[in-house]
Every structure is written in C-alpha cells, then in structure tokens.
C-alpha cells in the first residue's frame, strides 16, 4: 500500500489527469494515470525514447496512430504503444473520453512538469496553445525523452 504527498490532480493541456500510482510509489517503475479528455483532444504526434504506454479506454472512443497503423478503440478496449515508434491519438467520441494509461519510464515526470495542479476533478477552461506554450511543452518533452514530431493526428 502506498500514498504520495505529490499532487494527484493535474490539468495537462486541455485535459484532466489523476495520478493513481506514481513511479516513486513502486519498485516496478510504472505510473498509472487516469485522463479525462474533451472531444477533439490529441497530443502532438510524438515518440517516446524510454516509455511504453498502454491505454485502457474507460469511456468514449479514441483514434490511435502508431507509425502507419490507425485504429479506433472504444470503452473496454486496450491499445499498447511501444517505445521508439511514433504515435498519437485523438478523442473522437462526442462526449469526450476517459483513459487509464499505464506507462514505464518518465512519462509521469513529463506530465507533472507540463501541468498545473488542478483545482478540481474537471476539465480546465479550453484554450488554444500559444507558440510559447508549444515551445515549453517541446522543451519539457525533450528533457524527458519524448520527441514531438508534428501536429496532432486527424
């Protein structure tokens, strides 16, 4: 059993993240995060040098692209995204989506560095990223072994 004093409720981009298990709380080097995301949400197309990510779709539907392969995943389905292979995803369901992401490596550190502590378990006010915000995200990602390759997928 473990519990961290670090913030567990974060606003990342236009989504909300709850850290259920921090890397510091286990010897296995994994994090488990829950993501509440609005329709149309998608991170820049990117590649992780050190992390594998496994998405379990709790609610809604997402479209994932890994290299040249594209698939949709609905509630109850799992998508594994291996390190070293470019990927991205987009929320395609009208009511948004809720994902559980199990990740190895420094994904959680990037989330914490690029997020604000959330005032509540809710979506933040939506906003378009400014060039400064995009530059800051690219720098934080690079510091955590993630290379941004392009815009979010369609």
Give the location of each predicted region:
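Glycine- and acidic-residue-biased ligand/ion/polar-headgroup-sensing regions
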Residues: 50-52, 56-62, 76
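Short acidic-glycine-tyrosine-enriched beta hairpin
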Residues: 25, 61, 68-86
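Short histidine-centered beta-strand/loop micro-motifs
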Residues: 21-24, 44-49, 90-92
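A contiguous, mid-protein "functional segment" used to position or interact
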Residues: 94-140
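Ligand-binding loop in jelly-roll beta-barrel domains
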Residues: 26, 63, 83-109
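A short, N-terminal "cap"/entry segment at the start of jelly-roll beta-barrel domains
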Residues: 1-30, 123-154
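Conserved hydrophobic/aromatic beta-strand scaffold that supports enzyme active sites
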Residues: 19, 32-34, 54, 70, ...
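Conserved short histidine dyad/triad with adjacent acidic residue
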Residues: 18-19, 33-48
């Amino acid at each position: 059993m473990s519990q961290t004093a670090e913030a567990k409720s974060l606003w990342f981009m236009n989504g909300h993240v709850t850290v259920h298990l921090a890397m510091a709380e286990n010897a296995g080097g994994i994090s488990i995060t829950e993501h509440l995301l609005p329709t149309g949400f998608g991170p820049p197309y990117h590649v992780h040098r050190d992390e594998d990510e496994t998405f379990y779709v709790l609610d809604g539907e997402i479209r994932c692209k890994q290299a040249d392969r594209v698939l949709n995943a609905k509630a109850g389905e799992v998508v594994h995204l291996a390190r070293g292979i470019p990927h991205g995803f987009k929320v395609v369901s009208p009511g948004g989506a809720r994902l559980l992401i199990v990740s190895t490596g420094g994904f959680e550190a990037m989330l914490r560095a690029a997020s604000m502590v959330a005032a509540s378990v809710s979506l933040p006010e939506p906003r378009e990223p400014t060039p400064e915000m995009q530059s800051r995200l690219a720098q934080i990602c690079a510091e955590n072994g993630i290379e941004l390759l392009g815009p979010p997928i369609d």
